[in-house]
Amino acid sequence: MTYRPLRTDDIDQYNDLLRYSFQITEQDLAESGWKNDEIKQSKFPVLDRADVIGCFDGQTLASQFAVYPLKMNIYGQVYAVGFVTSVCTYPEYSGKGIMKQLMYRSLAHMRSKHEPFALLYPYSIPLYRRRGWEIISNKISYIVKDRQITSSVNAPGMVHRVEWDDQAFMNLHNTFAQTTHGCLFRNSIAWEEYWRWEKDDTFVAVYYDTNHSPQGYMVYLVEADKMYIKEMIYLNREAQE
């Protein structure tokens, strides 16, 4: 077995292992508006700008471990962090200690880059807890009926729908992150991952105050008479309303 960083010429094997491990089917690609070649092309920046280590059996990629370089607000101080993702192994190579080796090598590389924190979305909390991670936040989903929402609000500004790459929208997130503990600052890689599986009918609405200054946004999808809110942030009570 050989361990080494992945290069752009490993993109086919990288993409194949991701699709196999996370069960991304042709139907999933079609429903999200992607084609396989487009997904593969979109992953080139990851291999260029992220730290991806793979384990090879000869010329065959058996396992991989990716770390995205990001920044995070932790109690008002900005830290460089490594966001762990694309952790996957073909089943015939599991139980051989490969992932443990990839994890150690990746964490050692993070340490050399002065990234003191490693973050991830665990598919198994007990598994990663045994390896030293702990929960820093929870995700709670709410189902709200339209009649439960206040119809009269005191918000003198205006709401405008904008494009996904609107600069005011992305700057709003950075402004929010500067004052919010536990919030990541999104760089280009993070924004690409944020949108990767969203449907084309997903919208971004930005609230502007009377001075035409953006104060909050909502990312949402309306489907089958239901509104799904992916993300909502606001800088003040006016924007919240």
Give the ranges of each region predicted by the language model.
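Conserved acetyl-CoA binding element of GNAT-fold acetyltransferases
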Residues: Y79-P91, K226-N236
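Conserved acetyl-CoA pyrophosphate-binding loop and the N-cap/start of the following alpha-helix
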Residues: Y93-R105, E238-E241
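Amide-forming acyltransferase catalytic core, primarily the GNAT-like/NAT-type
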Residues: K139-E241
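Conserved active-site alpha-helix within GNAT-family acetyltransferase domains
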Residues: S112-P116, P122-I140
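Short, high-confidence coil segments that cap the C-terminus of an alpha-helix
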Residues: A50, K113-E115, T202
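Short hydrophobic beta-strand motif reused across regulatory alpha/beta modules
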Residues: F65, W133-E134, M218
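Short amphipathic alpha-helix that is part of the acyltransferase structural core
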Residues: M1-P69, G76, F83, I149-S188, ...
